[in-house]
């Protein structure tokens, strides 16, 4: 077993060192004693080594990495079987340690100095059981935070003083994610924010819906950027948009609505399916102007709605408009906005046998975040009365795509294309 703590410096606080060592040795009883007896500020389950950035979760999982000597001798003179048994036992003890740390409030997506979360390490080492444990912890944390987002904090000062809890309690860093406002539902996580702060360019201004709508956009052949160089839409998404349009519109003559025109990629493919009616909701005035310049308002069946979907859709519902297909691809909106869209608006706009989809970029700048948000959205869709099917599409290598873009919003290998419909 490799020693994940071998590089610990002598300047590490003794208590921190003991906690991290106990985590790496999967010594749960000792961990429990150390954590319960800790009298320092902060959660001891989230202490960090200053030289590696390891938290106890990182240390517990990294301890399962085989050392070089063990790797070299595997398969020689029948040693594979014993090594495999030893590794299974090691992973099992790690699982117990991870379970305990999560129960104590360990942050599932904390970043080390190698820009890895505990789940990233588990995935890199092929430790599926541990990876799934971290994913499930992320799902629980995100579901909780999303629910808390819907509650107003107590405004009674006396209540706050009596309980010792005010808004700070709701702001504990128990979990991720980003918000970069979700460009095309690309969520920015707390982990990503830390990474941005460590970069040479810095994190830059927050991406909010109001800032985006007030910004000047730059249109080129292969990308659409806002004034902060955030990628609003890029040409590499073309295959995804083509497949989405064909899945939503398997036949001609259907009624469709797209929310978020951007570069017009998906709307172009929708036109190829010869819809009977093609409604487009677009909030940014620069995009609307570009649409008119390109003659979108003159295309067959096209109706352009200028404004935010939050203002447009209720009016369409009141008018009795319905659609066979709906696509959602907005920029700089939060997951809460998206949840409101499918929970409150789709039900009044989609035909009973209709289909709808969305650009699935939530957490796509880190595989574990992408996996977490797939489960989160599945649960929320189920609660709203929708079934969802996923189709995996291989994403091409994008190394050269991000030149001139503030940050890559896509790093995972496969895109999961969603197709949603009402439950039977």
UniProtKB/Swiss-Prot annotation:
Gene: rmt2
PANTHER family: GUANIDINOACETATE N-METHYLTRANSFERASE
GO cellular component: cytoplasm; nucleus
Compositionally biased residues, Polar residues: 71-89
Superkingdom, taxonomy of origin: Eukaryota
GO biological process: methylation
Subunit structure: Monomer.
Name of this protein: Protein arginine N-methyltransferase 2
Keyword hit for Magnesium: no
Residues covered by the RMT2 domain: 205-424
Protein family according to the UniProt entry: Belongs to the class I-like SAM-binding methyltransferase superfamily. RMT2 methyltransferase family.
Function: S-adenosyl-L-methionine-dependent protein-arginine N-methyltransferase that methylates the delta-nitrogen atom of arginine residues to form N5-methylarginine (type IV) in target proteins. Monomethylates ribosomal protein L12.
EC number: 2.1.1.-
Biased amino acid composition, Low complexity: 163-173, 187-201
Binding site for S-adenosyl-L-methionine: 212, 241, 261-266, 282-284, 309-310, 329
Disordered: annotated span: 67-89, 151-212
SUPFAM superfamilies reported in the protein's UniProt record: Ankyrin repeat, S-adenosyl-L-methionine-dependent methyltransferases
Keywords, comma-separated and alphabetical: Cytoplasm, Methyltransferase, Nucleus, S-adenosyl-L-methionine, Transferase
Molecular function as annotated in GO: protein arginine N5-methyltransferase activity
């Amino acid at each position: 077993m490799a020693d994940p703590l071998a590089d610990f410096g002598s300047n590490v606080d003794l208590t921190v060192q003991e906690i991290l060592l106990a985590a790496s040795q999967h010594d749960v009883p000792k961990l429990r004693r150390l954590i319960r007896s800790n009298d320092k500020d902060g959660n001891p389950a989230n202490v960090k080594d200053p030289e590696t950035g390891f938290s106890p979760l990182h240390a517990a999982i990294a301890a399962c990495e085989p050392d070089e000597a063990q790797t070299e001798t595997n398969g020689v003179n029948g040693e594979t079987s014993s090594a495999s048994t030893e590794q299974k036992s090691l992973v099992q003890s790690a699982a117990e340690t991870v379970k305990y740390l999560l129960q104590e409030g360990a942050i599932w997506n904390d970043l080390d100095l190698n820009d890895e979360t505990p789940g990233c390490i588990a995935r890199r080492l092929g430790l599926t059981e541990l990876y799934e444990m971290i994913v499930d912890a992320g799902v629980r944390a995100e579901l909780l935070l999303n629910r808390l987002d819907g509650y107003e904090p107590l405004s009674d000062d006396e209540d706050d003083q009596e309980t010792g809890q005010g808004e700070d309690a709701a702001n504990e860093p128990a979990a991720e994610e980003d918000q970069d406002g979700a460009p095309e539902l690309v969520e920015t996580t707390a982990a990503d924010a830390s990474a941005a702060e460590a970069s040479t360019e810095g994190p830059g201004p927050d991406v909010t819906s109001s800032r985006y709508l007030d910004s000047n956009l730059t249109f080129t052949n292969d990308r659409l950027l806002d004034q902060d160089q955030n990628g609003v839409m890029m040409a590499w998404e073309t295959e995804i948009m083509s497949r989405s349009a064909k899945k939503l519109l398997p036949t001609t003559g259907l009624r469709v609505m797209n929310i978020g025109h951007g570069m017009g990629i998906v709307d172009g493919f929708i036109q190829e399916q010869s819809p009977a009616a093609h409604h487009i909701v677009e909030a940014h005035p620069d995009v609307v102007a570009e649409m008119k310049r390109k003659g979108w308002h003159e295309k067959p069946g096209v109706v352009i709605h200028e404004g935010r979907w939050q203002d447009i859709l209720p009016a369409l519902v009141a008018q009795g408009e319905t659609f066979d297909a709906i696509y959602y691809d907005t920029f700089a909106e939060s997951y809460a906005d998206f949840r409101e869209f499918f929970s409150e608006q789709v039900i009044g706009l989609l035909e009973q046998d209709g289909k709808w989809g969305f650009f699935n970029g939530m957490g796509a700048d880190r595989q574990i975040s992408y996996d977490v948000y797939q489960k989160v959205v599945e649960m929320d869709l189920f609660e709203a009365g929708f079934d969802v099917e996923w189709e995996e599409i291989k994403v091409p290598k994008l190394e050269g795509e991000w030149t001139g873009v503030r940050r890559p919003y896509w790093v995972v290998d496969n895109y999961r294309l969603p197709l949603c419909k009402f439950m039977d």
